[in-house]
Regions:
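Active-site neighborhoods and metal-handling regions in enzymes and metal-associated proteins
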Residues: 1-464
Length: 464
């Protein structure tokens, strides 16, 4: 937890940005796994953490902008809880730790909101991603649980996005720590990548590192020989010689700040010539982004530029043809890279995605696209100093997508389908690093680059 002055300052800024009314920020509850007493690993809501800092479940933070009052609502534990879980500070003590003057039992929250509504104060809350919180909100505010998104405050969303999108010095230190944990995870994955070891075994090793150094992984690890599956979870299948292992994994540090990196490792210890060709194509796009990303440059242009670099290299491999600009404008490259270049990162690995990507990554001028591939771009706006972005181009050979496009004759003027068939069982390559946008350019969030050059990846894989 940061010093209470940081949370106080954040709430004061939020008041100024919202202007009037009552802001209600819901913390998360425990979520049962297979029966009520066996819960999933607890994860606090990120916006609640940002403004109220407390990790305990069952809390709601309230900021009355008009009357300049702040409350923490929640229930104190009883002796039965103490027997099983030990002593937990009272809600009043938790409030004081983050500079909040008032606390009250959860049962009083509804009456508090009723009084605010009777006084015609606007009520500001965020869209919710958990059904139990949606039900809680419906009980308090009086609308159907499925209507919470429609009633969410755009004013509050935009205010929080503006604050959380630009990372402050204390946050950058936490992100650096998360990145350094991620370095250890990916090097361990490379060292353990060999024929006969299961995907699940390696995932267990790297997730153990994340748990031992922080709060665990920042998302379920993607670790698979089938890198063409964008979110392929680890299986119990043993790694096979000749294939590539794609590992997309990250960590949360003790303050819940995230990291997210992707590397690809040859199971045999050496890349084949075919694998090198695709790997270098992706790396060229990745490196171009690192060279060009700076304040004022649109992330949309970074994405399209990376796609042009990838297309040029695929033309050299005879997988694509024709004019590069025309091919990218038509979306032909999306058969190979059907996703966006990257995303914001912070307290969420896809930072603030639950608030709506139209607010986080777009504006009135730059809107989300409907074109296949480009429609998965999570950000298009100009970069600003303090943004933390992932740089993660990729190239994939997805058999079902190849068959669909080939059968439709789609983009046949740009794609050499006969040559693509030679890569049908290739899998996929994605290379991802976390970048901090600085005053004049960008730098890695962490202290050191995870091995990425082909010779370095092979060295770690073969020799440890």
């Amino acid at each position: 937890m940061f010093k209470k002055e940081i949370y106080t300052s954040r709430r004061e800024e939020l008041k100024r940005r919202v202007g009037n009314g009552v802001i209600v920020l819901f913390g998360n509850n425990d979520a049962p796994c297979n029966y009520p007493g066996n819960t999933y690993r607890y994860r606090q809501d990120s916006s609640f953490l940002y403004f109220f800092g407390q990790q305990r479940e069952g809390l709601v933070g309230v900021i009355d902008v008009d009357n300049d009052e702040e409350y923490l609502f929640g229930d104190d534990i009883d002796i039965d809880d103490i027997v099983w879980f030990g002593y937990v500070p009272s809600v009043n003590e938790l409030a004081a730790e983050v500079g909040v003057s008032h606390s009250a039992p959860m049962a009083e929250l509804r009456d508090y909101i009723d009084r605010a509504q009777q006084s015609h104060q606007p009520i500001h809350f965020l869209p919710q991603y958990r059904s139990d919180i949606q039900i809680q909100m419906a009980d308090i505010f009086g609308f159907h649980p499925l209507e919470t998104k429609r009633h969410a405050s755009v004013t509050l969303i935009k205010a929080i996005v503006a604050m959380r999108r630009v990372k402050r010095p204390e946050e950058l230190e936490e992100l650096r720590e998360a990145a350094d944990i991620c370095y250890e995870m990916h090097v361990a994955a490379m060292r353990n990548c060999r024929e006969g070891v299961t995907e699940h075994h390696i995932a267990g090793i790297i997730e153990g590192i994340a748990m031992s150094k922080g709060r665990g992984y920042s998302f379920q690890s993607i670790l698979t020989m089938h890198g063409e599956i964008q979110h392929g979870i680890p299986s119990f299948k043993p790694l096979q010689a000749g294939r590539l292992m794609l590992c997309d994994a990250g960590a949360e540090n003790k303050e819940n700040y995230c990291s997210d990196n992707t590397r690809v490792t040859p199971v045999s210890g050496k890349f084949t010539e075919q694998q090198k060709g695709i790997y270098e194509a992706v790396k060229a796009a990745h490196d171009w982004v690192m060279a060009e990303a700076r304040p004022g440059v649109k992330w949309l242009d970074m994405h399209l530029g990376a796609c042009r670099i990838l297309t040029d290299h695929l033309k050299q491999l005879n997988l694509m043809k024709g004019n590069t600009d025309d091919a990218v404008a038509a979306g032909a490259h999306a058969m190979f890279m059907p996703h966006g270049l990257g995303h914001h990162m912070g307290l969420d690995v896809h930072d603030m995605e639950g608030l709506g990507q139209e607010y986080v990554g777009f504006n009135d001028e730059i809107r989300p696209s409907t074109q296949f591939g480009l429609n998965y771009l999570r950000c298009g706006i100009p970069l600003e100093k303090g943004f933390v972005m992932t740089d993660e181009p990729g190239c994939y050979f997805i058999p079902h997508l190849i068959d669909l496009w080939k059968g439709q004759g789609l983009h046949k003027e740009y794609i050499n389908y006969d040559e693509v068939e030679k890569y049908r069982d290739f899998g996929g390559v994605r290379l991802e690093d976390d970048l901090l946008i600085t005053e004049t350019g960008n730098r890695l969030v962490g202290d050191k680059m995870i091995p990425i050059e082909i010779k370095d990846v092979e060295e770690v894989t073969v020799n440890g």
